[in-house]
């Protein structure tokens, strides 16, 4: 398997989904603006997403994929099918209970996660109503993530990577065509989320059948393999929960700030998630099953080379992305969001949060490479301990930054915490002698810094000659923005080429 081609396939699918996601957010911003209704929806949408990351894409994948890879390589197809059946049964049961409980307890959940909303009765009631509609998304997307994890282990990476596009299509369709028929209109977005979850699950099932892993969920509390996953999920849930608890606490802080703060942070987070999703999530998706196979077969040299390859790709693409995100924060927010009810003030507040987030972009992406280094070895406790330390320091930074920087201070805390998390993970990998960097890192980093400086100069020069970004229609603004971005990309890779960088060095292959 060519890892670079697999990464390109997953990244391209993820990029398409993120671009469509930006279109979705731009449409939502234009139709609904940034106020009480959107604050209510984003809280109601964020909570199922947080639980999805805990139960599905987070803890479950960390516990499930390494054991699934072991079954696939050592136990044979029949045993693997039985294993998948029992695991899917337990996951369905657990998530069904969580979903029903969440729908019944929606008002109390809001009281805990966004207590500032309780001061406004209408806002609190609307958020509770929206949460009851969006909660089934947890069950649907968790099952979709289970299917995706299996497909990834069979190297069918592009199929799960495309699935999130269906959620964006659902939300765009409901926002444009269904919102006028709902009262209040924001209810359309909540129903779009649930429909999107159904589409993501149904789309992947035929592909699961093609690889012979489409089985009916069954409950067996005594199956050794399924119980290993459950046992691993304990510390995994704790570790993932720590990072998600940090996001919930940030929402609690933001709920006490000016109206619109939750929305400003959401839109900034969406922009930051573009590079972190396209690269970080794609790398993590490919590396976890690949590292798991190397560990299961005892090939430590291959394991070490995979880690080094992933880290170099991180810095190659994340460093310029972080710098460009900060430089282009203004043009990005204005070009994508400043239309209709989304005012210039909203764009400015979103820009401030985006600049703060960009500080931690490298950390966010590097974590996606370093953490699988532990998960693939079925060591979940080490990342958990690091996550707890990171959570404590994040809240201390929140208290320090929220006064002078308001919502941007909360974003800055998340960014700095991501860098701290990455640093501690790297330290433990070296300390435990799990990973040893390959030769040539100093020269590699020096070349990157020089190329980023060249790119920064080109971007600043392009911004200087561009007209005011709030002028013109969306297509005109986006064309100008694309011209600036392409000029920056060309400058960066041209500088690397002059310095002797070769893309073929990253054409890693593994089995």
Each predicted region: which residue ranges?
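Membrane-embedded alpha-helical bundles of multi-pass transporters/translocases
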Residues: 1-511
């Amino acid at each position: 398997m060519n890892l670079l081609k697999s990464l390109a396939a997953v990244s391209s699918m993820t990029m398409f989904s993120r671009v469509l996601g930006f279109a979705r957010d731009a449409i939502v911003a234009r139709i609904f603006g940034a106020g009480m209704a959107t604050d209510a929806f984003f809280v109601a949408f964020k909570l199922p997403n947080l639980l999805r990351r805990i139960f599905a894409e987070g803890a479950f994948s960390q516990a499930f994929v390494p054991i699934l890879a072991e079954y696939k390589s050592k136990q044979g197809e029949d045993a693997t099918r039985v294993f998948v059946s029992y695991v899917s049964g337990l996951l369905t049961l657990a998530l069904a209970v969580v979903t029903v409980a969440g729908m019944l307890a929606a008002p109390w959940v809001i009281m805990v996660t966004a207590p500032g909303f309780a001061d406004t009765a209408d806002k609190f009631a609307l958020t509770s109503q929206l949460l009851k509609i969006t909660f089934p998304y947890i069950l649907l997307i968790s099952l979709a993530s289970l299917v995706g994890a299996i497909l990834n282990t069979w190297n069918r990476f592009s199929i799960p990577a495309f699935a999130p596009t269906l959620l964006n299509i659902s939300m765009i369709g409901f926002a444009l065509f269904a919102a006028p028929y709902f009262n209040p209109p924001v209810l359309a977005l909540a129903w779009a989320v649930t429909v999107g979850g159904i589409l993501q699950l149904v789309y992947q099932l035929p592909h699961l059948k093609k690889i012979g892993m489409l089985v009916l969920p069954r409950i067996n509390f005594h199956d050794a393999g399924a119980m290993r996953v459950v046992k691993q999920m304990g510390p995994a849930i704790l570790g993932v929960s720590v990072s998600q608890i940090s996001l919930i606490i940030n929402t609690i802080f933001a709920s006490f700030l000016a109206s619109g703060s939750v929305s400003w942070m959401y839109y900034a987070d969406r922009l930051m998630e573009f590079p972190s999703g396209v690269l970080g999530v794609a790398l993590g998706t490919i590396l976890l099953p690949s590292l798991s196979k190397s560990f299961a077969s005892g090939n430590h040299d291959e394991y070490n080379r995979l880690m080094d390859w992933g880290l170099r790709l991180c810095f190659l693409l994340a460093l310029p992305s972080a710098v460009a995100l900060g430089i282009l924060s203004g043009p990005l927010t204005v070009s994508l969001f400043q239309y209709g009810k989304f005012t210039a003030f909203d764009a400015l507040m979103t820009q401030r949060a985006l600049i703060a987030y960009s500080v931690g972009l490298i950390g966010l992406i590097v974590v996606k490479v370093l953490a699988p280094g532990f998960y693939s070895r079925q060591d979940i406790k080490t990342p958990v301990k690091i996550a707890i330390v990171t959570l404590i320091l994040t809240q201390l930074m929140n208290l320090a930054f929220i006064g002078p920087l308001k919502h941007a201070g909360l974003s800055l805390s998340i960014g700095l915490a991501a860098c701290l998390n990455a640093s501690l993970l790297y330290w433990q990998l070296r300390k435990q002698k799990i990973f040893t960097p390959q030769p040539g890192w100093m020269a590699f980093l020096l070349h990157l810094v020089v190329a980023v400086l060249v790119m920064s100069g080109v971007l600043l020069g392009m911004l200087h000659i561009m007209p005011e970004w709030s002028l013109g229609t969306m297509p005109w603004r986006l064309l100008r923005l694309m011209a600036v971005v392409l000029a920056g990309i060309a400058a960066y890779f041209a500088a690397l080429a002059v310095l002797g960088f070769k893309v073929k060095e990253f054409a890693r292959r593994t089995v």
